[in-house]
From Swiss-Prot:
PROSITE patterns: AA_TRNA_LIGASE_II
A biological-process GO annotation: prolyl-tRNA aminoacylation
Species, as recorded: Frankia alni (strain DSM 45986 / CECT 9034 / ACN14a)
Signal peptide: none
Catalytic activity line of the entry: tRNA(Pro) + L-proline + ATP = L-prolyl-tRNA(Pro) + AMP + diphosphate
Similarity comment text for this entry: Belongs to the class-II aminoacyl-tRNA synthetase family. ProS type 3 subfamily.
Name the record gives this protein: Proline--tRNA ligase
Length: 468
């Protein structure tokens, strides 16, 4: 009997199987909540560490703001509260008494951080103010799916204030490119389309939203990260102003941007196969698993010796010598968990002076001299990283069609992405597509870049797809 449902047979069921068998997550007791198991959290910690370093390289610093937000804060920005109202969790009783003012459980923090940006911004010398926080947020989800849509999830959200529109726009763009696109491409090995959201799809209260859209294994789109230009909407609502170099008062220009545990779901669906996860080596909590073929003292000792050499080479290594589990069961476990390379150590191999290296992405095996194993594995990991990206890119290219009518776009988007000039779609065509559960994922320049500010929308290409 197969361990996992085949992706071709039932992709959603396969996804649930991977979550369970790879021990990534489980459903919480309240509908829409999620328990992230240790292995799933280890993957998230690796994501956090890399993204956090990129955010800090872009000049932002970490802070933390309250989970509870006065309801009146959200009402200050009308478009923002309207966009989030259906998803809000509101607390009306505290300490057994009805609260004087209801408080909202944080759905995002533009409002409460805006309150403090106003407090901390007095002069142009205080700007730019670049903040990030790692937190949980709550958005009541009617159709939950672990990692993809949950009522509570983990994320980072950045919030910045700037002296002028150009500086704010440039920073939001920098985050979209240097933090999100580069991380998704270089670490998660997921090639993403990057562009701007349409008026209908942009973040509530934003003047512009940039998005990274990945194609999953079933051809659907997943929004992986977003970066928003907020104009002066929140600055006006929260009085974020400053004394300029000219001696006059000016409103600040603000941005916000975020990525979440949804990226874990994207990792599963972009790279997973019928044997389970396939984790890119740059991300993998364990890059190499060393498997003794037999529960033999000499073989296990040699396996630990090999693991020590690989650890000394700077790799993240695990020895799986669990007694009571067959070699085949341990191989299956390593495959389901997506460990990029396994080193199989058996008595026959050792007698010949070899070990066997196995790539998780291709299942290709190679016998290598024992003395060369520690030197060979790092290069093999690089090959796995490149191979996963190449495979994901090939899938995206094979399932992305250039079309010239809305009808053809709708047909192509049943199994992948459709690219079509925006002037042939427009807001009227976008509304028609929504009737078939299709959305415009983003607008791009013809060469696939983020559209320039003030450009003619008729010159842009839009990407249409089904989405998660």
């Amino acid at each position: 009997m197969a361990v996992l449902t085949s992706r071709a047979t039932d992709f959603p069921r396969w996804y649930q199987d991977v979550l369970a068998k790879a021990e990534l997550a489980d459903n919480g007791p309240v509908r829409g909540t999620m328990v992230i198991r240790p292995y799933g959290y280890a993957i998230w910690e690796r994501m956090q560490a890399d993204v956090d370093a990129r955010i800090k390289a872009a000049g932002a610093v970490n802070a933390y703001f309250p989970l509870f937000i006065p309801e009146s804060y959200l009402r200050r920005e009308a478009e923002h509260v309207e966009g989030f109202s259906p998803e809000l969790a509101v607390v009306t009783i505290g300490g057994g008494k009805e609260l004087e003012e209801p408080v909202v459980v944080r759905p995002t923090s533009e409002t409460i951080i805006g309150e403090y940006l106003a407090k901390w911004t007095q002069s142009y010398r205080d700007l730019p103010l670049l903040l990030n926080q790692w937190a949980n947020v709550v958005r009541w989800e009617l159709r939950p799916r672990l990692f993809l849509r949950s009522s509570e999830f983990l994320w980072q959200e950045g919030h910045t204030a700037h002296v002028d529109e150009a500086e704010a726009a440039a920073y939001a763009r920098r985050i979209a490119l240097e933090v999100y696109r580069d991380f998704l491409t270089d670490v998660l090995a997921i090639p993403v389309f990057i562009g701007t959201k349409t008026r209908k799809e942009r973040f509530a209260g934003a003047t512009n939203t940039m998005t990274c859209e990945g194609m999953m294994g079933d051809g659907k789109a997943l929004q992986m990260a977003t970066s928003h230009e907020l104009g002066q909407n929140f600055a006006r609502a929260f009085d974020i102003d400053f004394l300029g170099a000219d001696g006059a008062k000016h409103l600040a220009w603000t941005t916000s941007w975020g990525s979440s545990t949804r990226m874990v779901g994207g990792l599963i669906m972009a790279h997973g196969d019928d044997n389970g996860l396939r984790i890119p080596p740059r991300l993998a909590p364990t890059q190499v698993v060393v498997l003794p073929v037999r529960d033999d003292e000499t073989v296990v000792a040699k396996a630990r010796e090999i693991a020590a050499a690989l650890t000394d080479a700077g790799l993240r290594v695990q020895v799986d010598a669990r007694s009571g589990l067959s070699f085949g069961r341990r191989v299956t476990d390593a495959e389901i968990k997506g460990i990029p390379v396994r080193v199989e150590v058996g008595p026959r191999d050792l007698a010949a002076g070899n070990v066997t290296l196995v790539r998780r992405d291709t299942s290709v095996k190679a016998a290598v001299p024992l003395a060369e194993a520690a030197a060979r594995v790092p290069a093999l990991l690089d090959e796995v990283q490149a191979g996963l990206h190449a495979e994901a890119l090939a899938l995206r290219e094979s399932r992305t069609a250039d079309v010239t009518t809305v009808a053809d776009a709708a047909a192509a988007a049943q199994t992948g992405f459709a690219r079509i000039p925006w002037r042939l779609v427009g807001e009227e065509g976008e509304a028609r597509l929504a009737e078939d559960a299709l959305t415009v994922r983003c607008l791009q320049t013809p060469d696939g870049e983020i559209p320039p500010a003030g450009g003619d929308p008729d010159d842009l290409i839009c990407l249409i797809a089904r989405s998660y």
